[in-house]
């Protein structure tokens, strides 16, 4: 069985500020003392430089811990007349290692199709970033028993355009749309069922990828349900939304992941 390092990625969405970043690092410096889990902070792009500077300033205090920086979005284009967009190279230059791709809010609010998501996945990897690919079903799709069908479609188009081995340098996040920002989380059993399906789906084309890819759960993860979720054999941590804005809660989630 592969030893997959747990990950906790905090997606601030359009929230937070430089003071929140400082508060997080103050707590990290005294509490994160080992590398048994990887922590990723994904602030709004305007605060990437603040987080990068905090990573540099706290390098000694965080010695032994794995704290990285990620972005919430990336353009599928390398450069050009795309007002408001940020390229993969720009994110790489800013110190990012990860970037969230295909979050349900981007798909729903900004019309990001699966084809665009696949292009952004490729753009991220082209510039040395590791994509955190989000997949998940809506409430009606779950009620219609189409969960696996929807997720297979979202995975397959990325595989078709980028190849299975692209997942050797990628993270997958299962985020059921009916649980994102609603306070209603999937049960540990529901999460495990879908994570096992994702792993099996990838294993069918590459046993190595299927065994080694990290799959996070995202959808109203809190300190009260994280231990049971992270204990599932195919759940490798969490993509955290609201709880990532509370330094105490986020630190608790990191600690839980470290002992998972």
From Swiss-Prot:
Q: Which SUPFAM superfamilies match?
A: Triosephosphate isomerase (TIM) (SSF51351)
The kind of enzyme this is, by top-level EC class, is isomerase
The name on file for this protein is Triosephosphate isomerase
Enzyme nomenclature, EC number = 5.3.1.1
- Keyword Isomerase: yes or no? yes
Coding gene? Answer: tpiA
Can you name the source organism?
A: Shewanella denitrificans (strain OS217 / ATCC BAA-1090 / DSM 15013)
Give a short account of what the protein does.
Answer: Involved in the gluconeogenesis. Catalyzes stereospecifically the conversion of dihydroxyacetone phosphate (DHAP) to D-glyceraldehyde-3-phosphate (G3P).
Catalytic function, reaction form: D-glyceraldehyde 3-phosphate = dihydroxyacetone phosphate
Protein family membership: Belongs to the triosephosphate isomerase family.
InterPro entries per record:
Aldolase_TIM, TIM_sf, TrioseP_Isoase_bac/euk, Triosephosphate_isomerase, Triosephosphate_isomerase_AS
* Keywords attached to this entry: Cytoplasm, Gluconeogenesis, Glycolysis, Isomerase
Q: What is the lineage of its organism?
A: Bacteria, Pseudomonadati, Pseudomonadota, Gammaproteobacteria, Alteromonadales
- Is Isomerase included in the keywords of this UniProt record? yes
Q: How does it assemble?
A: Homodimer.
């Amino acid at each position: 069985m592969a030893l997959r390092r747990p990950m906790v990625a905090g997606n601030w969405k359009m929230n937070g500020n430089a003071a929140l970043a400082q508060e997080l690092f103050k707590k990290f410096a005294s509490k994160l003392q080992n590398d048994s889990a990887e922590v990723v902070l994904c602030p709004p792009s305007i605060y990437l430089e603040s987080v990068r500077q905090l990573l540099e300033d706290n390098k000694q205090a965080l010695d032994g811990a794995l704290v990285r920086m990620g972005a919430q979005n990336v353009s599928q284009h390398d450069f050009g007349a795309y007002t408001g967009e940020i390229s993969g190279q720009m994110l790489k230059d800013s110190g990012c290692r990860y970037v969230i791709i295909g979050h349900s809010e981007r798909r729903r609010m900004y019309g990001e199709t699966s084809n665009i998501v696949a292009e952004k996945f490729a753009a991220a990897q082209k510039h040395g970033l590791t994509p955190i690919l989000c997949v998940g079903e809506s409430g009606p799709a779950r009620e219609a028993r189409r969960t696996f069908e929807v997720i297979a479609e979202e995975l397959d188009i990325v595989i078709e355009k980028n190849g299975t081995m692209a997942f050797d340098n990628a993270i997958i996040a299962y985020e059921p749309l009916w649980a994102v920002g609603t306070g209603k989380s999937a049960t540990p059993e529901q999460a495990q069922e879908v994570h096992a399906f994702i792993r099996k789906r990838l294993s069918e084309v590459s046993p190595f990828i299927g065994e080694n890819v990290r799959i996070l759960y995202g959808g109203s993860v809190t300190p009260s349900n994280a231990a049971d979720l992270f204990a599932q054999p195919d759940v490798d941590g969490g993509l955290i939304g609201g709880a990532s804005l509370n330094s105490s809660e986020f630190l608790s989630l990191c600690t839980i992941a470290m002992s998972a």
